[in-house]
Amino acid sequence: MSAIALTVSMLALVAVLGLWIGNWKIYGVGLGIGGVLFGGIIVGHFAQTYQIVLNGDMLHFIQEFGLILFVYTIGIQVGPGFFSSLRVSGLRLNCFAILMVVVGGLVTAIIHKLFAVPLPIILGVFSGAVTNTPALGAAQQILTDLGSPPQLVSQMGMGYAMAYPFGICGILLVMWLIRLFFKINIDREAKAFDSSYGQNRELLQTMNVAVRNPNLHGLSVQDVPLLNSDEVVCSRLKRGDLLMVPMPATVIEIGDYLHLVGQRDALEKVRLVVGEEVDVTLSTAGTALQTARVVVTNEAVLGKKIRDLNLKQKYDVVITRLNRAGIELVASNSANLQFGDILNLVGRPEAIEAVSAIVGNAQQKLQQVQMLPVFIGVGLGVLLGSIPLFVPGFPAALRLGLAGGPLVVALILGRIGSIGKLYWFMPPSANLALRELGIVLFLSVVGLKSGGDFINTLVNGDGLAWIGYGAMITGIPLLTVGILARMLVKMNYLTLCGMLAGSMTDPPALAFANGLHPTSGAAALSYATVYPLAMFLRIMSPQILAVLFWTL
């Protein structure tokens, strides 16, 4: 068997064994995708024992390409919500996530200096303790750039493997300890969250308003500023028994009923000016109008503003809501259309058909992957990651690397959505498949490279000490941030658990947090809020630590 065929066969064996190990669960907790690392260690141990030689260049390429695939698909997935998560609504949660990363870095620095742990080992332990595989890849690359010997860089995988199991279990232990220490009642926390979130959430609502203001009589809809703002959409007008879609030139009369869509505070502003809220149905049932949901798939309209389509004037159709990546937005005239946007339409059946053809509404396109944008994004990411940043006093130029470069590019492209006919939308199933493939390839190679000396290090070397260091890097930041969040800002416990899981970019911990109260969405919401920024910081932090430790 050729070296290439043997290498591919061994990687397949590692993946099968590792995924099988990852599916093992003890009290509902398993290693998940991390099992691939241990599958690689087992196979790597026997490969060295029986002197099986694999193609080193091929292993190196597969490891790096797997990492690129993983971080790029992560960036495309979280890109649309990354920048919005930094706004005021998630500012507090993201501040705690930043604090956790900083405390983890400080603990790592103290252990490195206090116990004289070699730099490659402590960075590997750090990556495993926070269960973040891209951090390991980023740390390996920056150490290689700094000139660290390859045999030392390869030891990082062992440090990662030693710390990883407690990284998975430690966060669950901390959640339990916080619950015990503060004597938390889960049902009470869930009710408190539902009450608070129900009052503050920025979901779109509807309101039927009767025109009572005599100053509006005889004015057209376009002459009333509040009815043309980006915060409220007037989707229907009822006059007597006639229900219509209001055009910009439609004249308002006293006694008209308007159906408005927007956030509650914006609707209240319109009500104060227009008249009073009334309990009158403006349903399209039994009328010439109907409602429909269509998907934007036509490349010709991507990036265009809703006003540019002139749907009201041409087709007497109004867009009442815009759903983007599961988030409902006001369909303001200035909103740009992106691939995969779901539009709620109101109009006559034949007009809705015409509008559907304009925006695309081709469901099958949502299941197709445009490969050209994928490789453009990957190429740009690698180029960005290769750009050297020279800092006076540093022994080597800083780079975003193969982990940071593709991530930053993917975040930006995911936020932009499309450029001309190129769109970076990726079906969730395709994104997940590429992401899982990438991480399996990366972990398989890391495990194979680490397996030869793993058992000896654990039994006869410093393996147990590394496990202890990892436990400190896992536990101290989690306990510090968890206690501060609960004591200082009285953070809801379910929200706190989701924030801790998101800060560790740990899906098994999210599953555990969701299981605390299955009907509450508190944990999932806070996890999604902090995950994008936390993932970015987790990838960048070992590179910063590596450069700082190297120079000190």
Swiss-Prot record:
Residues 192-276, 279-361 form the RCK C-terminal domain. The keyword Transmembrane helix applies. The chain crosses the membrane at residues 1-21, 26-46, 65-85, 96-116, 119-139, 158-178, 371-391, 393-413, 439-459, 464-484, 493-513, 530-550. It is a multi-pass membrane protein. One of its GO terms (biological process) is potassium ion transport. One of its GO terms (cellular component) is plasma membrane. GO terms for molecular function: monoatomic cation transmembrane transporter activity. Its main location: membrane. Keywords: Cell membrane, Membrane, Repeat, Transmembrane, Transmembrane helix, Transport. Belongs to the AAE transporter (TC 2.A.81) family. YidE subfamily. This is Putative transport protein YpsIP31758_4141. It comes from Yersinia pseudotuberculosis serotype O:1b (strain IP 31758). The lineage of its organism: Bacteria, Pseudomonadati, Pseudomonadota, Gammaproteobacteria, Enterobacterales.
